Amino acid sequence: MKFKYYFSKDFQTSDNHDIETLKTHYYHARKEVAIEAVVQMAKDFKCKIKSIDEERGEIIFDNVNYNASATITATSYTEMAIDFIVLTFNFLPTAPGKKVIEKFYSVLDKTLQFKGISLYK
């Protein structure tokens, strides 16, 4: 991990990210099922759901340590890409956003049928 990431308070996933654990994850699921899984995951992490936009596939949630946004993009009817943006509130940032995203993906990998990482870069 690059030095600049150790002091960053915000992290975002993408297909082309240079950190392997922050690359987009793809799942074999319908959009409604993926949205439901992300909402349930957020509730399990004791987050408050701020907004759910099913048309755009965006879910915004937060708790006392971070704000997060999940974007669910349909690459086909039964394949979804899920990306996260996490902004943390820690006084001494030591890449906590990266750890939060890794926890999110580990839960979703068990909940949804995992297809792959960064499939369409």
What does each model-found stretch correspond to?
Residues 1-121:
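Ser/Thr-rich, low-complexity intrinsically disordered terminal regions
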